[in-house]
Structure formats: structure tokens, C-alpha cells
């Protein structure tokens, strides 16, 4: 069943120009009684949709997979992945790409239904999703967007009227995810594992045309592709670290070629600064701990380089050298981006030799005194040194003098320094206890007002507005560590 186009659907399906081994065409599985519980108005408008039309029953049916919009071409994408270091052939086990929306400005975005039913890649899964994890992805992805961190986004969440069974019976839901594309490091691993150089080349050419058209005429365009992805990921991971975001499941199937954050299953934001922070219940070894994220990104990108080896160069020795040289650039690029970001967080415009030491000393003290990561930088930005173990310590007072004298030595005024800090230190993040509170109200009581208030506050994290202050309060200390789950 195909619906008409008053809502503004303008779908293309360029992914189907790839060899058919990369996808399986399959319709979504209908649900019994869909209900729209969240629509992203501003995102809808930017994509060329009419939000009021999207609220109508006929369009809600599309978000539920009960109907298809004009021009839809539903398919599940195939890919592989190293999951916690172990290689598997995978694919969209509970999601369908229904098409690529062409926006009024000529941009192309994947429209994917997540939780739309089983596919040939489901393995033993039911292809469905629960309401809590889908609302969680909506909240966190929109918070990331407001923090100016490249991310997939959420257009809508519908409940299905059907239960989903995990450890317990949960209300089912479908999320409409929007992405620049869903091409992953794992997509290239999939092509390489199948052994067809032609397919691998087709994927690389398609990816370049879609994401990096400026390198199409490059003499060594596949090396240039690797360079671009490394650059994008170095920038992305630096941005994660600078706001204390912990992804939780940095498997190669969750590393996008576009440089967007994808898959918000077991992610969370750090409260107390600790390099070893882990939230994911399945990351028992701390593989994807906060401090490990840059190293794991480099590891994942090395898997991309391995996958590209058949098309990087004909000479075996030369190709290994190219791959190793490019991967070694990741840490340099990451460190540069992170250091620049940290300098902005401390209001440092100019360069001085001891800047690195100044930053490291602060972080060391924050870890020692278990200081709240976001609120420490917030207090420095507001120049309100509160009564905390960190700020009361003699070593911090000594550091504070050094920092103040460093600010005084630069040409820019202190006012300008504090303004730059304000633009780089969010006063509000999606605190784990606040997210849980919003999900509990929505899922258990059908009360979405708590989530709406939270989303409103998170939409402007650099505002330092008085009405946001209740969301700046860290959780009450507890002996029970906060744990996240992938929701699959």
C-alpha cells in the first residue's frame, strides 16, 4: 500500500545501484494499532516534510510500517562487524531503509524504520524494539545534535500496540531514524569478506560519490577515502571526549563512514571524571571505557584499512605501508582536535608551552577528587568556585592561580576568554538519572511531559539559562553503578 504525497515525501533509492549482495528487499511487518508519541518538528521541516501532515493517521501508518510512502523501496542492508573484537557477518536485523529523502536544499538523508520487524539478517531476533530504548535514542541523539556533535537523528517514535519480549514484557515501538547514510566500516568488511573486488570497488565508488565527491577525481581516490574517514572520526571522537560522552558499543558496525554517531543503545554521559568509566552491562572488560574510545576508534579504522587493501594498491608491500601510514595519522589528528577543544574549554586563545601541562594537571585533580566533569568546567566558566573537594584542595587553588595568570598573559580580554568557554562548555547534558526519570514517566505512566521538558532544556546546552539549572544537578551518590543496556 503506497500513500500519497501531501506530507512532502521525496524519496530516491540510490543504494539499490549497488550489487544486490549489499541488501535484501523486504517490506516492513505491519503492527496492530500504531500511535504517534513523538514527532521532531524542526527536523521534519528541514527534510522538506509538512509536520502537520505527518501527524495524520495515514502518515503514522508509514512510521509504523503499515503503509509505504510514494517512491519507497524498503530494504535491509547487509554488513559485517567486529563485535567486542569478534568478527561476524551481520545486517539490519530489525530495521529497514525505506528510501533516501531529498531535501529542499538538495541533500540526501536515509529514512530508516528501526523495530520494523524481522529480516533475513535477524538471526534469532524478533525484529522489534521496545519503547524505552527508542525514546532513549530520540533524547540522546537530539542532545548530541544540540551539542554540535555529528549524529544520526530521530524523526518520530510510534508505539505499535503490541508487546515486545525481552527480560520482561515491554510496550513495542518503532523509531524513524535519519542519517546521512548507514554505510559503516562493517559494510566494507562485509564486501571484503565476500571476496569480490568488483563489489568492494562499487561500494567505495558509491561512498565517495555520496559523501566525498571532492575526491572523485583524486589520483588515489581509495587512499583519499580512507584519509577522509580517518579525519572525520578523529574529529568525532575528540568531540565525544570533550563532553564526556561514552558510546558503549564501538563495534565496527557502529562506526559510520560519514562520521556521524550511530546506535545509542548502551551509551551515557559521564558524571564524575574517570578515564575508566563504563556504563554498558555487556562491556565487562571495559573495552569501550571512556579513556579507551580513541584507541578503539583507531582499531576500528585499521579494520577499514584492511578491508580496502585489495583496491588501495597493486603492490603488496606498498599497500601495507599505505594502510599503516594512514592509520598512524589518526592519533595525531585526534590529539590535535582534542587539545584545541580543551584549550577552548579553558579560554585559551594563544599557545604557550605549558598549556598541555595545565590541562593535564586539571584532569588529574578532577579524577583524584571524583569531580563532576560537566559541572567543573561549568563552574570555571561562570567563575563560581563552589564548595567541593576539588575546589577546596590546595593543589586546585595553586592550579587556579596559574590558570588565571595564563589568561592575563594573552592579548584577548578575560571577558572574551569566558565567552569562548561558555560556547564550549555545555551547562547541561542528558544526565543519566534525568533520562531514566523521563523514560519511567513515559513508559510506565504514559506521561510524556517529563521527556518534553528535558528535551526543551537539552535543545540549548550552551544557554546557561536559569530555568535549566535543575538539570545541572548531578545524581545523588550511590553504591550502585549506573548500567545501560543495548535494548536488542
UniProtKB/Swiss-Prot annotation:
Q: What is the lineage of its organism?
A: Bacteria, Bacillati, Bacillota, Bacilli, Bacillales
Q: Where is the active site?
A: 253 (proton acceptor)
Keywords, in A-Z order: ATP-binding, Magnesium, Manganese, Metal-binding, Nucleotide-binding, Nucleotidyltransferase, Transferase
Q: Where does Mg(2+) bind?
A: 254, 263
> Which residues, by range, are in coiled-coil regions?
none
Q: Which gene encodes it?
A: ydiU
- Quote the catalytic activity from the record: L-seryl-[protein] + ATP = 3-O-(5'-adenylyl)-L-seryl-[protein] + diphosphate; L-threonyl-[protein] + ATP = 3-O-(5'-adenylyl)-L-threonyl-[protein] + diphosphate; L-tyrosyl-[protein] + ATP = O-(5'-adenylyl)-L-tyrosyl-[protein] + diphosphate; L-histidyl-[protein] + UTP = N(tele)-(5'-uridylyl)-L-histidyl-[protein] + diphosphate
Reported EC number(s) for this entry are: 2.7.7.-, 2.7.7.108
Entry GO MF terms:
AMPylase activity; ATP binding; magnesium ion binding
Q: Which cofactors must be present for this protein to function?
A: Mg(2+); Mn(2+)
Q: Which parts of the chain span the membrane according to its record?
A: none
Q: Superkingdom of this entry's organism?
A: Bacteria
| Similarity comment text for this entry | Belongs to the SELO family.
> Which one Pfam family would you cite for this protein?
SelO
Binding positions for ATP?
91, 93-94, 114, 126-127, 177, 184, 263
Name the chain's protein: Protein nucleotidyltransferase YdiU
Functional description taken from the UniProt entry:
Nucleotidyltransferase involved in the post-translational modification of proteins. It can catalyze the addition of adenosine monophosphate (AMP) or uridine monophosphate (UMP) to a protein, resulting in modifications known as AMPylation and UMPylation.
